[in-house]
């Protein structure tokens, strides 16, 4: 039987580009401090998918597959992956000599134990739904035997949206939130205070992947800092002040007006990342009264997304109806007829048809992410004008994120998608399908059929058609309101060198202080 091979060197396409620029002397040492607006109440390697947690965990935790600079899946902890001709077996040859932070060498037993744990405990365990079993014929070979064709399996293994982190066997047997923060990354855990900071230090035993340079979330990664500290500073003005005072070297989510001021500071630099994320409004489809599709459709018809996004982002946005960006091959217009309709007459008609009696609708938001707070404020007023009884609840981000994963206690929740729109449709599978559906529409037959087609189709055109059907259904049933595409102002010390912005993730390897 012939097999297709994906070698480690595949996708490392930026090395030549880097070589074309003058060499810059990298410097080892120093303590890097970055500030972000929100934290996380879990660092469990298999139990979180938020952007805040990803920034904190990315330098510690690693996976078999990663995405490169162009979001193409490439091997990382694996040397190569071989795919059977019928697509029913994936054979990973592991890199030899890869060390965990404990000094123990990673073997196939650790990989199997990690995936077993992920498949049992992770909220995103649908990644493993097509896997029949995992074989480990020797210490450096792992074979995934599939129940059925799953054409996006490698894409999902590579996605950082919900990482399938490899941890030691002895950690994999522990319950949620009881593991030590151990993996194979270039930095290792030092300390964590959930409300204030995470600190990591350079892992001196790190075994970098072969190659000339880092590439996306893989390639040859080098830890230059002695330590990296991620500080949680919720107020934007306080983050900016800390940067100006030299207390931190990097901040994200800088307000537009503050960014303009920072641009005149010779000691600082500002990078504009647009698009950077997609603000959304989640809608609980099983909690009354938003379990009424007509009511959801009425609210969607009333909203003016331009007004919402202008307030949420200080004007740093683009209107976009799709859950992927316009340059993505899966971009389509299925959701366009439902987007930013702003039609009061139509909305009132749908509201009357829904039989809505003024029951309270609980809308969750938080001030950690100002775009979530501002978007909720504006949308709540638009919906009140329609005659909807909105009750706004302002929580901290970790509490809000936890509550929005429960089937009761809320109706709407201001949130955002960071990595998913950048990576593509397969990263939405965990959010828009089955038991992990973000709006709890786990028995929607249209989504079930479309995702099944997406996973079993070998032709790109067939997968595009399936994704178009998915986007149309999400919009028609109003499980999630897509608000638009937002930008992110990143500000940093001018002597922070090597930093490259990457949508949905902050990379602190191959970065140093001059």
Predicted regions and their residues:
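Short, well-ordered beta-strand elements
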Residues: 29-39, 79, 89-92, 111-114, ...
């Amino acid at each position: 039987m012939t097999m297709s091979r994906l070698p480690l060197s595949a996708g490392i396409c930026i090395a030549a580009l880097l070589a074309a620029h003058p060499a810059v002397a990298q410097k080892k040492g120093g303590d890097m401090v970055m500030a972000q607006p929100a934290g996380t109440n879990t660092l469990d390697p298999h139990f979180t998918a938020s952007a805040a947690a990803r920034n904190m965990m990315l330098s510690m935790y690693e996976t078999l597959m990663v995405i490169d600079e162009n979001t193409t899946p490439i091997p990382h902890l694996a040397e190569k992956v071989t795919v059977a001709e019928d697509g029913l077996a994936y054979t990973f040859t592991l890199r030899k000599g890869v060390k965990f932070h404990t000094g123990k060498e990673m073997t196939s037993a650790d990989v199997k134990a990690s995936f077993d744990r992920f498949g049992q405990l992770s909220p995103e365990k649908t990644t493993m739904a097509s896997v029949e079993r995992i074989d480990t014929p020797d210490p450096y070979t792992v074979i995934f035997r599939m129940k059925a064709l799953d054409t996006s399996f490698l894409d999902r293994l590579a996605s950082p949206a919900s990482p399938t982190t490899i941890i030691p066997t002895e950690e994999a047997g522990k319950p949620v939130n009881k593991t030590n923060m151990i993996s194979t990354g270039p930095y290792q855990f030092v300390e964590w205070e959930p409300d204030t900071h995470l600190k990591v230090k350079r892992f001196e035993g790190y075994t970098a992947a072969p190659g000339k340079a880092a590439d996306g979330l893989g390639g040859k990664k080098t830890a230059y800092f002695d330590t990296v500290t991620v500080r949680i500073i919720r107020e934007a003005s306080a983050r900016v002040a800390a940067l100006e005072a030299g207390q931190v070297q990097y901040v994200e989510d800088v307000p537009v007006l503050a960014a303009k001021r920072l641009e005149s500071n010779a000691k600082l630099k500002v990078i504009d990342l647009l698009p950077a994320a997609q603000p959304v409004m989640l809608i609980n489809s099983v909690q009354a009264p938003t379990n009424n599709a007509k009511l959801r459709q009425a609210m969607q018809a009333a909203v003016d997304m331009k007004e919402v996004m202008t307030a949420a982002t200080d004007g740093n946005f683009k209107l976009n109806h799709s859950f992927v960006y316009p340059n993505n091959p899966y971009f389509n217009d299925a959701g366009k007829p439902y987007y930013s309709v702003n039609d009061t007459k139509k909305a009132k008609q749908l509201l009357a048809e829904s039989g809505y009696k003024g029951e309270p609708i609980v809308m969750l938001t938080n001030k950690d992410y100002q775009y979530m707070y501002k978007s909720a404020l504006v949308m709540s007023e638009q919906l009140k004008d329609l005659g909807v009884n909105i009750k706004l609840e302002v929580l901290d981000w970790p509490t809000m994120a936890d509550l929005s994963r429960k089937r009761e206690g809320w109706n709407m929740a201001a949130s955002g998608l960071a990595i998913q729109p950048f990576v593509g449709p397969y990263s939405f599978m965990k959010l828009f399908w089955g038991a992990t559906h973000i709006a709890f529409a786990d028995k929607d037959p249209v989504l079930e059929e479309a995702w099944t087609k997406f996973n079993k189709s070998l032709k790109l055109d067939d997968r595009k058609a399936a994704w178009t059907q998915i986007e149309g259904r999400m919009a028609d049933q109003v499980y999630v309101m897509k608000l638009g595409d937002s930008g992110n102002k990143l500000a940093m010390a001018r002597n922070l060198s090597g930093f490259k912005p990457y949508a949905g993730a902050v990379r602190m390897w191959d970065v140093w202080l001059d």
